[in-house]
């Protein structure tokens, strides 16, 4: 039997998009109480406290792939406290559990960095990456800046500005690092990362150009 793919945040818009690209018979959605009904059809779910490392450890098994997608919806600078209370705390619990369970691969959606804005968000995601490293996990870290999708379309208006910025040597690297990706690109990159894990004990990072090329 193929190893499981255990996904936190599977009921969110990115989690659902990812599940549609996977063999659903292999997926276990780890969701908060009351969220199982929002998981994609055909995906098994387990309701638990996603902030409780003990519960998460008992849900995982050696050889599993864990994909951590929990995050504050529509992040903005006013949500700094939520970034630590939700994004970081859930990641720390999940990484700790994954280490104890000896999972094979940990996949985390971080954020493009460095960045001139959203410092609290970037710091929370950097701390999440550090927790993964501390747990000694083989990991794939994806670093998008903004994912265009349902309810997240207004930044399409900025695409012409990004195109201009990528033409100039002085702004090219920043524009590419902080470029936007589509929901299709993001879910495809996640699915490919799951299917092609890095060697044991190593960490692989996909920035925006890498996500687009996946």
Label the model's feature ranges.
Residues 3-24:
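N-terminal Rossmann NAD(P)H-binding glycine-rich loop of SDR-like oxidoreductase domains
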Residues 4, 64-65, 105:
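Structural motif
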Residues 6, 46, 107:
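Conserved Rossmann-like nucleotide-binding pocket used by diverse enzymes
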Residues 10-13, 101, 116-214:
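Oxidoreductase cofactor-interface core, primarily capturing Rossmann-like NAD(P)-dependent enzymes
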Residues 13, 28, 33, 77-81, ...:
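Conserved Rossmann-fold NAD(P)-dependent oxidoreductase catalytic core, especially the SDR/UDP-sugar
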Residues 20-22, 41-44, 60-61, 81-84, ...:
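Short, glycine/charged-enriched secondary-structure capping and boundary segments
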Residues 35-93, 97-100:
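NAD(P)H-binding glycine-rich loop region in Rossmannoid oxidoreductase-like domains
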Residues 70, 107-110, 145:
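Active-site beta-alpha turn of Rossmann-fold NAD(P)-dependent dehydrogenases/reductases
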């Amino acid at each position: 039997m193929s190893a499981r793919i255990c996904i936190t945040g599977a009921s969110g818009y990115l989690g659902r998009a990812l599940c549609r690209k996977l063999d659903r018979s292999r997926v276990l959605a780890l969701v908060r109480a009351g969220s199982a009904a929002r998981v994609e059809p055909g995906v098994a779910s387990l309701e638990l406290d996603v902030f409780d490392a003990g519960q998460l450890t008992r849900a995982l098994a050696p050889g599993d792939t864990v994909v951590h997608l929990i995050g504050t919806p529509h992040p903005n600078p006013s949500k700094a406290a939520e970034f630590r209370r939700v994004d970081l705390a859930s990641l720390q619990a999940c990484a700790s559990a994954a280490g104890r369970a000896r999972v094979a691969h940990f996949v985390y959606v971080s954020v493009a960095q460095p960045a001139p804005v959203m410092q609290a968000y970037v710091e929370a995601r950097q701390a999440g990456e550090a927790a993964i490293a501390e747990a000694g996990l083989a990991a794939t870290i994806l670093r998008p800046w903004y994912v265009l999708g349902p309810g997240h379309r207004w930044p399409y208006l900025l695409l012409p500005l990004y195109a201009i910025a990528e033409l100039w040597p002085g702004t090219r690297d920043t524009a590419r690092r902080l470029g936007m990706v589509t929901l299709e690109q993001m879910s495809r990159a996640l699915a490919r990362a799951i299917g092609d894990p890095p060697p044991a004990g190593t960490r692989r990072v996909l920035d925006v150009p890498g996500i687009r090329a996946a």
